[in-house]
Amino acid sequence: MVLNPVRDEFITAGSLTFHYVQWGERGSPIVCMHGLTANAFCFQALADDLARDHRVYAYDLRGRGDSDKPEHGYSVPIHADDLLKLLDALHLERPILLGHSLGALISLYFAAHYPQQLSKLILIDAGAPLPWKTPEEQPAWLTTSISRLGTSVPSFEEYTQRLKLAPFLGSYWNEYTDIYFEHDVHRKSDGSVKSKCYREGVIEEGQNYSEAALEQQWAKVQVPTLLLRAGQGLFTDNDQLLPEESVIAVQREIKDCRYVNFPTLNHYTIIFGVEGGPAREIRSFVDKG
């Protein structure tokens, strides 16, 4: 059953206003951070499970969804600073942090630099250096994700039909992908739609990627960590975001790191409720001691 958020609001943190949602009204807080071109509602499937006895928060990162979109200022350290201010504005003390994709990089950086500000860390299909070095080596699935930004499409139906052509989405489409993409777009009076995600911010994010310095963060993490990997490729059998050799390095450096691989899930389906495994692993980790 899809849970409605108990809060779907805006809050000012620092100089920006952020859109956030909260599912559940009791239990320990879990704060979720989404990926590069995503929005808070990508966590609806996980929230439907976890919000039964936890307060699950998710927010649109700067430049995404309904949060403010400054012209410049997009990097992992800047997002981590936003998170620090947001936790203060929401009066959340030592929450569990959960990040998917870019959100995992932000969560990792935050855990390394503000170790007293969280209780546990959950990294979903990211947390290690990208397996490509140049824009030319960027995988087709990421190019597909970015290509939708800044472009108007005649209708929401056509927008989603185009997305369903992607093999890593189309055959797995469900109510959670519907909810997610409904919140991805601005709807204009003529019926056309365009992604809310700020394209220039995403491009700047890529240019500033090195500031995340991921390998330097691992050993600084002081809290129990759960690392989930999507083992299924997207366009090919070996275009995963998180190679297995990277997992070995992460586990070696983070002192208390549990790792679970999901061979039949890809970078997107791991959060969209296609299988119950990710939610079960997260719940087990969250509820443990």
Which residues does each PLM region occupy?
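Conserved alpha/beta-hydrolase catalytic His-Asp/Glu region
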Residues: 152-208
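Conserved serine/cysteine hydrolase catalytic core
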Residues: 186-253
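Catalytic histidine neighborhood in serine/cysteine hydrolases
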Residues: 251-264
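Short helix immediately C-terminal to the catalytic nucleophile in hydrolase catalytic domains
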Residues: 103, 107-111
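Active-site loop/oxyanion-hole signature of alpha/beta-hydrolase fold enzymes
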Residues: 14, 45, 57-98, 102, ...
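Conserved HGGG/HGGXW glycine-rich cap/lid loop of the alpha/beta-hydrolase fold
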Residues: 19-66
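Catalytic histidine-centered segment of alpha/beta-hydrolase-like enzymes
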Residues: 262-274
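Flexible "cap/lid" loop of the alpha/beta hydrolase fold
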Residues: 109, 119-156
